[in-house]
Amino acid sequence: MAKEPVRVLVTGAAGNQEPILVKEESVVGIPTPLLKLKSWQWWVLVSVNIFFLIGGQAASVLLGRFYYDEGGNSKWMATLVQTAAFPILYIPLLLLPSSASVESSESSCSLKYIVLIYVLLGVIIAGDNMLYSVGLLYLSASTYSLICATQLAFNAVFSYFINAQKFTALILNSVVLLSFSAALIALNDDADTPSGVSRSKYIVGFVCTLAASALYSLLLSLMQFSFEKILKRETFSVVLEMQIYTSLVATCVSVIGLFASGEWRTLHGEMEGYHKGQASYVLTLVWTAVTWQVCSVGVVGLIFLVTSLFSNVISTLSLAVTPLAALVVFRDKMSGVKIMAMLIAIWGFASYVYQNHIDDLKVRQARQQAQAGRVEPPC
């Protein structure tokens, strides 16, 4: 009889229990070589995935802003490139050894339900990407990133209602601070906007970006709900498959939108009129698509190596890096209000992380006490 794998549950910042990878323990669906990693090797992998996530997200936002600045104007094309390079994710998926455990998970959940989940989530992703594209069209890269940081606050709210997670004082503090940060950006009369963008379009961009952040957080909660209640497993292969097939659906929706809106007719003229030339136009779109998938690899990798909560927190941290990168690349204006908003957002982020740290310590201490109790001989 096979030994039952050990699953260590770590309580996240919002009270949610999630599996965390521990080197010495056997976890369902995780390749054996990974379990044999030494501590420094595990940290190297975590660091590489953090770099992929932060670097990929910052680069994709900057390239998206560059596309608009240099003459690009197709919102559906900007939406399409956010998921179009999803075949890259087949590389790590194909490297995973096939196992009976994966097959049993598929048989435990009807194929039609899995397809329905992927289609619904894919459509939501496409709509979310469109909102992000509109937001980036009317906002500077730094302002856009600061508003996107509110996704952590929305995530706490949706997790409370959908995933039954706790709402602690520190989490509430984080939600309030991130809300204040977004409000400062919204009320900033000295807001820097791309050339030709009116105040009304700035407001549209703000609302679309805020709505996109909320929708993205809802998407994360729905994915977590799908893993826990329907798929009933969260292994690397299952997470990666969801990322691939939802991106496939989102890409199809974006292509349909591109043709249905008639924007495809303007693409040739857009490429010819691109300020940096036609080659630069193609390379900008290609590298935007690639960097978004590099970001996705980082997200999935951190879910695999640590937890989905940690992956989301690092994703939010990367949004604080983008304004600094935009300051260097695009010379974005950093007004006093924007600096204050960024500091408040970092404070809210730190509050969220600290709550996660406290909960993590409690679970680790409880686990150590339980292990010590099993080892000690009876008196």
From Swiss-Prot:
The family this protein is said to belong to: Belongs to the purine permeases (TC 2.A.7.14) family.
GO terms of biological process kind: purine nucleobase transport
Domain of life of the source: Eukaryota
NAD as UniProt keyword: no
Alphabetically ordered keywords of this record: Membrane, Transmembrane, Transmembrane helix, Transport
Summary of subunit composition and partner proteins: May form a complex with the potassium channel subunit KAT1.
Protein name per Swiss-Prot or TrEMBL: Probable purine permease 11
TM ranges: 43-63, 76-96, 114-134, 144-164, 167-187, 203-223, 239-259, 294-313, 314-330, 334-354
GO MF entries: purine nucleobase transmembrane transporter activity; purine nucleoside transmembrane transporter activity
Membrane topology: Multi-pass membrane protein
Keyword field contains Transmembrane helix: yes
GO CC entries: membrane
